[in-house]
């Protein structure tokens, strides 16, 4: 970080870092969006054609801005440095798919997500224990590292993909991600967890706010897989660092239901020939727009309100 000389108060450096991350994200997106690939419109999405022609893949801008801000202003050790690299790797897999004339296959993307998830699990276990804390109920349990690694891979892979599937309405996945990671930030402080990654949460949140400045309805550009996949892995790492990974089920509840329901529905139909929720369009944000006739703004606000209520209740339970 730039404060290696100790010449400045850490709180001042942190304050400047937050302003820097937001400002540079806004400026970079304004100047560089013309160089991004153009969206082709999602054929099967509700109002997918409205996105056609918009710059896509803006995740590459706000993710690189976040990483630069983290290196300059956060207390980055080797573990956090590796996480930053993995976030960039996941972002790049999404960006190259965004920029490709022919979209990458589902199996290729799923395999790359799996590889990244395995690396996250190995790195986390190298620097941390295999103890799972129960932040709400109290107590903890130590499980064999191999089992912990398997659960971590599932968590990371699932987080990447449900977050990616939730990216279909202007401002939705970005807003939900901010609520999720800020809930994790509050829980970290309640639990007394103060490390370099805790501050990285704030930097990532303000970079997302800089992106949302342009992505609010009607959006001028889209984050693409470059943004959604990076958000997914960031959420997973952030919740792992709380030491209570099961909190993911609550702090990311709306993302899980919105994006995960479609994944489950597709997997059951494709591999087991079981057709569930025949009258429900997935992701759920498309069902809300198509079947319930919600506007984009209503989807974002109502989904956000639901997650905020769950998050507030979760924080309260952790504090008890």
How does the language model describe each region?
Residues 2-257:
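"…together with the soluble PPM/PP2C metallo-phosphatase catalytic core" -> "…together
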Residues 16-19, 144-145, 269-271, 314-315, ...:
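A short, structure-level motif marking secondary-structure boundaries and short turns
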Residues 30-53, 99-101, 263-294:
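Cytosolic, membrane-interface loops and tails of multi-pass inner-membrane proteins
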Residues 248, 252-256, 276-280, 297-301:
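Short amphipathic alpha-helical interaction segments
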Residues 297-318:
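Final/C-terminal transmembrane alpha-helix of multipass membrane proteins
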């Amino acid at each position: 970080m730039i404060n290696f000389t100790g010449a400045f108060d850490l709180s001042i450096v942190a304050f400047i870092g937050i302003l820097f991350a937001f400002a540079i994200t806004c400026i970079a997106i304004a100047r560089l969006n013309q160089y991004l690939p153009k969206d082709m419109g999602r054929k099967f999405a509700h109002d997918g054609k409205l996105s056609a022609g918009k710059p896509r893949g803006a995740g590459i801008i706000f993710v690189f801005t976040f990483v630069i801000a983290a290196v300059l202003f956060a207390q980055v050790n080797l573990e956090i440095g590796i996480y930053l690299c993995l976030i960039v790797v996941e972002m790049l897999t999404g960006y190259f798919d965004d920029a490709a004339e022919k979209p990458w296959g589902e199996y290729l993307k799923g395999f790359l997500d799996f590889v990244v998830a395995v690396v996250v699990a190995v790195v986390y276990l190298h620097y941390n224990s295999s103890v799972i804390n129960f932040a709400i109920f109290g107590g903890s349990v130590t499980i064999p590292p191999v089992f912990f690694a398997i659960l971590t891979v599932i968590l990371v892979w699932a987080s990447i993909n449900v977050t990616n599937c939730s990216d279909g309405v202007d401002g939705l996945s970005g807003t939900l991600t901010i609520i999720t990671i800020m809930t994790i930030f509050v829980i970290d402080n309640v639990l007394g967890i103060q490390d370099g990654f805790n501050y990285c949460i704030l930097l990532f949140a303000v970079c997302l706010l800089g992106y949302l400045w342009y992505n609010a309805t009607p959006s001028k550009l889209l984050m693409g897989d470059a943004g959604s996949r990076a958000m997914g892995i960031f959420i997973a790492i952030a919740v792992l660092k709380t030491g209570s990974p099961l909190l993911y089920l609550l702090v990311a509840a709306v993302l899980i239901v919105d994006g995960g329901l479609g994944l489950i529905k597709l997997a059951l139909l494709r591999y087991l020939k079981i057709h569930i929720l025949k009258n429900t369009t997935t992701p759920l944000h498309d069902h809300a727009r198509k079947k319930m006739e919600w506007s984009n703004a209503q989807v974002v606000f109502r989904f956000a309100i639901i997650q905020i209520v769950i998050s507030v209740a979760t924080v309260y339970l952790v504090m008890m």
